[in-house]
Amino acid sequence: MTKIIYCIYLKKYAEGLKFPCYPGKLGEYIYKNISQEAWNKWQNVQTILINENKLNMLCAKDRSIIEKKMKKFLCLKPL
């Protein structure tokens, strides 16, 4: 059975994520407030950002950049 949540990105009710896709408190917040559709859109944008900016996800600085972009893209409040 699918979980329906109010997605703060799409501003409508939609199918929620099947499991938390991000660690920590931010991951819990995303799980409760971001839909699968919005997360898929973010993953596409994330891939473009990583490739165009040649970011290395093993580097903490680059991961921080992606996290900031994710928060902005998904309209997440500061935690």
UniProtKB/Swiss-Prot annotation:
It comes from Blochmanniella floridana. Monomer. This is Probable Fe(2+)-trafficking protein. One of its GO terms (molecular function) is iron ion binding. SUPFAM superfamilies: YggX-like. Pfam families: Iron_traffic. Signal peptide: none annotated. One of its GO terms (cellular component) is cytosol. The keyword Thylakoid does not apply. NCBIfam families: PRK05408.1. Belongs to the Fe(2+)-trafficking protein family. One of its GO terms (biological process) is cellular response to oxidative stress. Could be a mediator in iron transactions between iron acquisition and iron-requiring processes, such as synthesis and/or repair of Fe-S clusters in biosynthetic enzymes. InterPro entries: Fe_traffick_prot_YggX, Fe_traffick_prot_YggX_sf. Gene3D superfamilies: Fe(II) trafficking protein YggX. Keywords: Iron. It comes from the Bacteria.
